[in-house]
Each structure stands twice: as structure tokens, then as C-alpha cells.
Amino acid sequence: MRFIVGRRGGQTGADAADETFTTLAGLLKRGNSYAHAASALILVCADEGEDERTARYAAVDAGAAIAQLTIEAVSRGLIAHPMAGFDVERPAAFGVPDGVRPFAVVALGHLGDYATADEAIAERDSRPRERLALEQVAFTGRWGNPL
């Protein structure tokens, strides 16, 4: 696992972003524009190795790293939001070598004020969360046989 970290605020000023943060923010798809207000943006990359088997491990490793980063963030009173909505071709600007795949960008920071958020994002976030029923996602014996 490797991480490219861009920071906003801190010693450079409340809203000033370093060049890495600005570049990472530019990779995000429009629906993730709220992340421009984060304190940090983290590009999560994993080495896909030499063959298909190790490439599959890269995805598992990236997911585990993101999960652990999220748990640590929450334990420190922060929010971590992983996003797959970014331009996966442009991380080459960071010198990401061949064979290393960018999997996600994680926004890290404190929860913002919805009074100052984009109205569409505030409305989307206020909707009740709906999840599929366990019977639709967990099976026993064979695919489609509810647990």
C-alpha cells in the first residue's frame, strides 16, 4: 500500500491547500466536489504485482487499508469518506509507476456545516439511508438461496 496525501489548512492557513491537495481535488468527479472542503485528500494505491492472483490481493489490501484508516479517523473524532469517483488515468501526474493502481481517494476531516454546503448535497445526505435486506446480499449453499 502507498498513499499520496494532500493537505488543506494547518500551518499554511485555514483554507490554503498544498499542491498535492489541489491536484487530488481536480481528479474528483463532480458528485464528490464537497470533498474540496476536507482537511486532507489521500490517494490510496496498491501494487498489483506480476500476475492476476496478486492483482486480486491488491484490491483486498486497498479495501482493508481504507477500512483501517476510517476506523482510526473515527477514533480521533474525524470523518473519512472513501470515493471511487475520480479520474483514474490522471494520477500519473504524481509519478505513480506502472503496476501500481490507484483504488480510491479518501477525504479526511471534520464534518462540515450543512448550512454552508451545496443544497443538493445537503438534501442527499438528509435522506434516510436504505440498505438491501440481508436475504438479498447473504446466501447459503448457492447464489440466491437466502441465508
From Swiss-Prot:
Q: Which Pfam families match?
A: Nitroreductase (PF00881)
User: What molecular functions are annotated in GO for this chain?
Assistant: oxidoreductase activity
Kindly provide the name given to this protein in its UniProt entry: Uncharacterized 15.4 kDa protein in ask 5'region
Organism, by scientific name, is: Mycolicibacterium smegmatis (Mycobacterium smegmatis)
